Amino acid sequence: MWTRKAAFTFTGGIALILIGMMISNHQMMILGLAFIAFIVVNSWVSGHGDVEVQRTLSADNLYKGDDLYVELLVTNRSRRKTQQLEVYDNVPHEMKLRSGLNQMRLNLKPGESARIRYVLRCPLRGHYSVGPVSLRYRNTFNLSVDEMYVDHHSDIIIFPQIRDVEEAFIRSRTAKMYTGATTLRTPGPGTEFYSLREYVPGDPFKNINWKAFARTGELMINEKCRDAVTDLYIILDSRDIARIGTVLKNPLEMGTVAAASLASFFIQRRDSVSLTIYDEKLSFLPPDTGDKQYFKILSSLAGVAPRGTMPLQAVTNSLAARFSRGSPVFIISSCEGDGTVPSAVRDLVGRGHEVTVLSPSSIDFERLVSRIPRMSYEVLKIERQ
């Protein structure tokens, strides 16, 4: 493709030839022919080398707010120079360039390589793709430009942030008959001996090891291993109303952080965790444990988006047969625009489940994007409580 400079040169050459013919000026005609010949010869010798592009990422999976280090290796595989080569690596607009540049002008000799390094900040969770790579070749006199794309994509998943969860002895009221081959070597309520520790005020006297007290003269407590794996169910509200607020602060974002933190805590305890997301449809991930289940949960949370208006009662009715008897249930929802929440919670409690509702206040998030009078805000908070 010709540049503006080449177009003006070609047009000027044609004009000089025509004007020279009209006024019988051979010198002007020769000058016009020189311009045309210059364009033709330049087009004949122009071109570019065979360029190979490789991209390396510091990680394929990151947490929200982390930095992604990107390195782009550009190699000239041909036997000619690339002349003026512009390289631009396309990045998602949700990511911010923290340091370095994702574009560079190069002039590579045959077999020569160059590296482009830059750092991206990942402020939003989701599934993203870095690429493709845009290449623009300019010849020596900047008369022609060739543009092309290298279809090289690098997929990356940004997980929600993980917050610390305080220790909580949450367990199923009904022990599982078959817990598999997982050995639970962590302290908690149970029957199998784990270790001895010093007495702390508030410990039950029935757990005091009197033989150790007679031998050492200090009160020692018998720590027990947790008896069985607990099936834990997390229900996340992803309805359209969960988008209230800003992009970074809204009920859905807070809900994904809470769900990811709970899943991390209980999977580290070697419990089985299930995730249910409801919006316009119902997505159910059966309970399981281990790193594979943890990755499935984080991947599901990374791709969740607000849509739909499914009520909670429909969710609990559909999943009632899949819930293990007496298992804890966490409901993460703003509870706005859904009058079935109280009846759904009562049904779960009636079936013997220990229900915990985590409800981010949509009123506080709405106040970030709209002007709510102070008095109205206080009234809405009282009504919500």
What are the language-model segments listed below?
Residues M1-G49, P311, F323-P328, C335-Q385:
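Von Willebrand factor type A / integrin I
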Residues T289-K292, R371-P373:
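Short low-complexity, flexible loop/linker segments enriched in glycine and/or proline
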Residues T3-R4, N250-P251, G290, M310-L312:
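Secondary-structure junction/capping motif
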Residues Q27, F35-D291, P328-I332, G339, ...:
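An amphipathic, basic-hydrophobic helix/alpha-beta surface used to engage anionic
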Residues K292-S327:
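Von Willebrand factor
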Residues K211, A305-T309, S333:
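Short, flexible loop segments at the rims of nucleotide/cofactor-binding pockets, characterized by
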